[in-house]
């Protein structure tokens, strides 16, 4: 059994910092978040995954262009044609989006309630997926204590949009600790909100709870450097057996440090920057 864990799509969120450059690839910049998500859906179809989990922030705050929502519906429709269900919750950005309340999603998409945590059961696979959506952007309560108890003998997946302890640079929405997640007794926590990928524990042993942020699909500015994407998770019965990184970003941000001497002029600086860039792309 395998599934995709994604989060923080931020569809149609603008890529910032390149508008001052006339030769920037304007069309690629405009469609980057969409193109990354199309690549992810392509992988889901090629891999014939059993389902997809999206842990919040599909949309980008108060973005009001309904074409964004219609695009998302079309991609969900592609998965529906392949009989791939999607389990998603709404995060802080979705909670303030008009599209969250106004658009009707295909019947293969299952959305967690914002009233209380609930469970979607895939009986044929003995999988229980637990989660709760944000009702409002500033959701500062710890949701974990009210998540359902794990189903004995099944693979239990918790879906949560949270800052988690140790991520002070992110708004402290739905705060919780690693120990609280571990104590819940789920085998896998599919988290969202933090845009950097992390998988805990780093050196996993059999039976340990996996706590994972996939990061966002597409870096949007220089503070979101390096490869971006999602996670392909494989399980056998009630045990997580493998986690594969899926790089789907179509543009990548990277800061390069170039050493210059006191006698170097602009031409030397440009040559050094060029060599550093060639080394990065090699």
What label would you give each PLM region?
Residues 25-32, 128-133, 254-270:
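Acidic/glycine-enriched edge-of-secondary-structure segments
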Residues 225-228, 234-282:
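C-terminal functional module detector
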Residues 1-69:
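N-terminal active-site segment of His-dependent metallophosphoesterases
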Residues 44, 149-151, 246:
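Short glycine/proline-enriched loop/turn "hinge" motifs that connect secondary-structure elements
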Residues 51, 62-242:
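His/Asp/Glu-rich metal-coordinating catalytic cores
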Residues 39, 43, 47, 75-78, ...:
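A generic secondary-structure signal
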Residues 34, 38, 73, 271-274:
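Generic alpha-helical structural signal
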Residues 29-32, 36, 47, 64, ...:
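Catalytic cores of large soluble enzymes that bind and process phosphate-bearing ligands
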